[in-house]
């Protein structure tokens, strides 16, 4: 009987640490629900002690996710563990994940502790976490550079203290597949109580071997793999879970294990993570890149036409990649739009609001005539982003610009219960619109990143604008999507301003309630 490999997703913890702008609670919840739909066994969704925002995100996800086990990270510190337990309290099933550096380098230069101290700290932390749950995971940070004798000792001690999962991270992506597989093999040979815990691996991609190291670990007996969607994460990123999942599925003959993942959900979950995190997927990215199933060579094209298996080891359908690009027009009704969305795997209510989507569809169809599958997906994504009542909404804008005249913009915004208008000049039409919006809202931001991308094909493509803006030391991500790039730019900035407005409301409410959650700048890349 094939054994199952547990899929542990840390997109919302380790992955989010690498983003230029933190995700909002709503954005994290969207990703968490998509991961649940995809079937991940465990999702690590934050580091509650690190900030009130992370605490709130973990608590919100713990309240909503029912099918996956929700996990939070904590150092081997009592306050960390207590905060994690409090944030997770509402979950049907939860895990506390605590970690400690074990390599000689980290112990001497970072923690200034002996290895015996590390064992004592690990035991204490695991025992404290077990006050709240039987599901405790312990990670040996920088295990890849930890002397093997020491690693065996602390793994045995962690299991003896009650850790149900022991994680062996290659924290800095230093090991090779043969070496890393050997570490896991040695643990199984030398740790006497290893049968009482699941051995997990968490590989980083600094040398481009995170996925290969994870597969090697599976072959040596590891039965949990940690990683992120699209491989996002600190430095060069984490093991890309979609690669490990599809490697397990495609190479059943070699690996003889399976996962509980609904692999048809991989593509759209990957796209959602890319859009919300503002991290485009490289075209040549394995499994989910735009070229993953593309064939340019004449010989390859001929071979694929004769039999797809000549040059495809997996099918686009196996990851849920839509192949048909049916078009709709302004004469199409709600039923047609709903049917097409359902054919692409989206569920009304959970993934889109039909009435809002249909109204956006009609506006787009009036502008460009035909609306394709990728248009509908983009509209549904923007609809999910803007489904909360926004304080700021664009009512009207007009721009005058040319090669020999200064750009001038007139903008009218709905600001809560009132309407305000301003005009401004700028260095180009986008800057002029931004200056006018800034005057209306009286909120000053610095644009850290501005990115324009096409959604669709040819002259009818939609223009998506993603921006990262900084306000009072915090970074916010905004997105806009229309057929007009100036309007998309305006919508992206307004999206940011609504994030800022909501953040102010949350902070005011937190101060009113005198939240006890401490704000500590903390991060980990174990």
UniProtKB/Swiss-Prot annotation:
Pathway: Amino-acid biosynthesis; L-leucine biosynthesis; L-leucine from 3-methyl-2-oxobutanoate: step 1/4. Keywords: Amino-acid biosynthesis, Branched-chain amino acid biosynthesis, Cytoplasm, Leucine biosynthesis, Manganese, Metal-binding, Transferase. It is an enzyme of class 2 (transferase). GO terms for biological process: L-leucine biosynthetic process. It comes from the Bacteria. It catalyses: 3-methyl-2-oxobutanoate + acetyl-CoA + H2O = (2S)-2-isopropylmalate + CoA + H(+). Catalyzes the condensation of the acetyl group of acetyl-CoA with 3-methyl-2-oxobutanoate (2-ketoisovalerate) to form 3-carboxy-3-hydroxy-4-methylpentanoate (2-isopropylmalate). PROSITE patterns: AIPM_HOMOCIT_SYNTH_1, AIPM_HOMOCIT_SYNTH_2, PYR_CT. Mn(2+) binds at residues 14, 202, 204, 238. PANTHER family: 2-ISOPROPYLMALATE SYNTHASE 1, CHLOROPLASTIC-RELATED, HOMOCITRATE SYNTHASE-RELATED. Belongs to the alpha-IPM synthase/homocitrate synthase family. LeuA type 1 subfamily. One of its GO terms (cellular component) is cytosol. Homodimer. Its EC number is 2.3.3.13. Residues 393-526 are annotated as: Regulatory domain. Residues 5-267 form the Pyruvate carboxyltransferase domain. This is 2-isopropylmalate synthase. Coiled coil: none annotated. Its cofactor is Mn(2+). Transmembrane segments: none annotated. GO terms for molecular function: 2-isopropylmalate synthase activity; acetyl-CoA C-acetyltransferase activity; manganese ion binding. It is found in: Cytoplasm.
């Amino acid at each position: 009987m094939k054994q199952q490999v547990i899929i542990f997703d840390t997109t919302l913890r380790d992955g989010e640490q690498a983003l230029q702008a933190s995700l909002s609670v709503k954005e994290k919840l969207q990703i968490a629900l998509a991961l649940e739909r995809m079937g991940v066994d465990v999702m690590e969704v934050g580091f509650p002690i690190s900030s009130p925002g992370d605490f709130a995100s973990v608590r919100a996800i713990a309240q909503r996710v029912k099918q996956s086990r929700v996990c939070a990270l904590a150092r081997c510190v009592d306050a960390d563990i207590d905060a994690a337990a409090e944030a997770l309290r509402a979950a049907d099933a939860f895990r506390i994940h605590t970690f400690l550096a074990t390599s000689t380098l980290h112990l001497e230069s970072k923690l200034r502790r002996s290895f015996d101290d590390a064992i004592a700290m690990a035991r204490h932390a695991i025992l404290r976490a077990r006050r709240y749950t039987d599901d405790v995971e312990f990670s040996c940070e920088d295990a890849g550079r930890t002397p093997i004798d020491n690693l065996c000792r602390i793994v045995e001690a962690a299991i003896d203290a009650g850790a149900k999962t022991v994680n062996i991270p290659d924290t800095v992506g230093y090991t090779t597949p043969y070496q890393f597989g050997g570490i896991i093999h040695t643990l199984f040979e030398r740790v006497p109580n290893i049968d009482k815990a699941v051995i997990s691996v968490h590989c980083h991609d600094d040398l481009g071997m995170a996925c290969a190291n994870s597969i090697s670990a599976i072959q040596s007996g590891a039965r949990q793999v940690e990683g992120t969607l699209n491989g996002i994460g600190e430095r060069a990123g984490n093991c890309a879970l979609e690669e490990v999942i599809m490697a397990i599925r495609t190479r059943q003959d070699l690996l003889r294990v399976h996962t509980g993942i609904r692999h048809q959900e991989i593509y759209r979950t990957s796209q959602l993570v890319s859009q919300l995190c503002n991290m485009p997927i490289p075209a040549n990215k394995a499994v989910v890149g735009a070229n993953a199933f593309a064939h340019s060579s004449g010989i390859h094209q001929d071979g694929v036409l004769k039999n797809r298996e000549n040059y495809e080891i997996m099918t686009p359908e196996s990851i849920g990649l839509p192949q048909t690009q049916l078009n709709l027009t302004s004469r199409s009704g709600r039923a047609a739009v709903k049917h097409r969305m359902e054919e692409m795997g989206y569920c009304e209510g959970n993934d889109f609001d039909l009435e809002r989507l249909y109204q956006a569809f009609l506006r787009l169809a009036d502008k460009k005539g035909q609306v394709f599958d990728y248009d509908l997906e983009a509209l549904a994504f923007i609809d999910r982003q803007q489904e909360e009542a926004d304080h700021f909404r664009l009512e009207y804008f007009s721009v005058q610009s040319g090669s020999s005249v200064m750009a001038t913009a007139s903008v009218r915004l709905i600001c809560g219960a009132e309407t305000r208008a301003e005009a401004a000049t700028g260095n180009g039409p986008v800057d002029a619109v931004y200056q006018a919006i800034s005057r209306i809202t009286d909120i000053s931001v610095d644009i850290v990143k501005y990115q324009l991308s096409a959604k669709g094909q040819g002259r009818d493509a939609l223009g998506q604008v993603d921006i990262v803006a900084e306000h009072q030391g915090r970074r916010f991500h905004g997105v806009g999507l229309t057929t007009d790039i100036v309007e998309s730019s305006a919508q992206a900035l307004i999206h940011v301003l609504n994030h800022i407005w909501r953040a102010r409301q949350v902070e005011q409410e937190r101060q009113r309630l005198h939240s006890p959650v401490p704000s500590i700048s903390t991060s980990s890349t174990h």
